[in-house]
Amino acid sequence: MNNYEVRQIRNLGEADPFILDIHYAKRKPSISYIYGLFDNDSYEEDRIIMIPELIGICSFGMSASPNLSYIAGEKHKNKVIELNRLVLKYNRKNEASFLVSKSLKQLPRPKIVVSYADTAQDHLGIVYQASNFMFTGTTKERTDMAACKGKH
């Protein structure tokens, strides 16, 4: 991981290929903060300079569920944020937990971070647990109605 760097992405459009093309949901969530995993040993050619390759993103934003902000009570509702996208180009060993842990360290404080593992996609939340998230259980089973182009 010595060749990797995690830094905030200021141009949200830079993450679009990850969110819209690679991630299974194919849609943008609410994004307040987004961090990129850059491989300093692999470069993408720009017209003038060589830039480290962006190989993953981790984004945080307001939850689609308004009730989530109240998990810590009225007093702390503005501190709650959801880790809503974790996308890797290659998904090599330890990249996910490295990106999550380094992204969490860069978030403005204080924050209460919540994330969900989509069991319908065979995600078990192991990356989050490896990043010291506290497992609090599963949500109620639900049925998602898919409209055209995979949107809810």
Residue ranges and their predicted role:
Residues 1-30:
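Short amphipathic alpha-helix that is part of the acyltransferase structural core
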Residues 8-9, 59-152:
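Acyl-donor binding region in acyl/amide transferases
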Residues 24-26, 48, 72-73:
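Short, flexible, glycine/charge-rich loop motifs used to bind or transfer phosphoryl groups or to couple energy/partner
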Residues 22, 40, 130-131:
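Alpha-helix C-caps/helix-loop-beta hinges
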Residues 1-2, 51-53, 76:
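A generic structural signal for short, non-catalytic loop/turn and secondary-structure boundary residues
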Residues 25-31, 41, 67:
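An active-site-proximal beta-strand-loop segment
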Residues 19, 32-58:
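Conserved beta-hairpin
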Residues 15-18, 46, 125, 147-149:
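Short, solvent-exposed polar/charged micro-motifs at secondary-structure junctions
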